[in-house]
């Protein structure tokens, strides 16, 4: 898929870093191992999207080489995404991340292909996620975040992303780690403008507003994955429903 701000791959990165920091804080906890796979292309002149791709690489480089993490968390970016790559990724995926801001996504088919191959979807109530939810049932999909009318209402009321930054310690720690160069020590300011565009720059796609719901829903994913029979039942329901 495309790497684009509205698709919010950056929100996925925020969760990855949240998970990384949490593992470091409590390494003896019974963590569900997670390999997070990114794949996609950005328009050649789309600076923010290119910066997100580079950030994914840098975050992966730090996490994948941190001996304290071991196999609890890995981050991979697969280049040159296309049909041939998708044919490998989609059958092997457990979880499909479809996390665009509600009201921005057209009804695509990538998420449907993943569901047809047995991946459970974590996503917003947007685009074809709505059709998948209707096809497989509310209990067989992980929906989080603001819905389209709520997005509209929040913007009209005067969205204040700094409120979310200041009121959520985990979110604040993640944004500070990225902004201060923890994942780009050779160039500490590399991602400062990208990250600071969220609390200070208006956060047009409402990443900070949906962050807490997204992280909480990822914990629900972990909880279900600890129950292989229940997970398999939901995966089968997705295949059958699609």
Where are these regions (language model features)?
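Long, K/E/R/D-enriched contiguous segments that form extended
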Residues: 1-87, 101
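A short structural micro-motif
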Residues: 6, 240-241
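Hydrophobic beta-strand segments of well-ordered beta-sheets in folded domains
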Residues: 34-36, 95, 121
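C-terminal, helix-dominated tail/subdomain
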Residues: 37-40, 94, 148
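Catalytic binding pocket for nucleotide-activated donors in carbohydrate/polymer assembly enzymes
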Residues: 91-92, 99-240
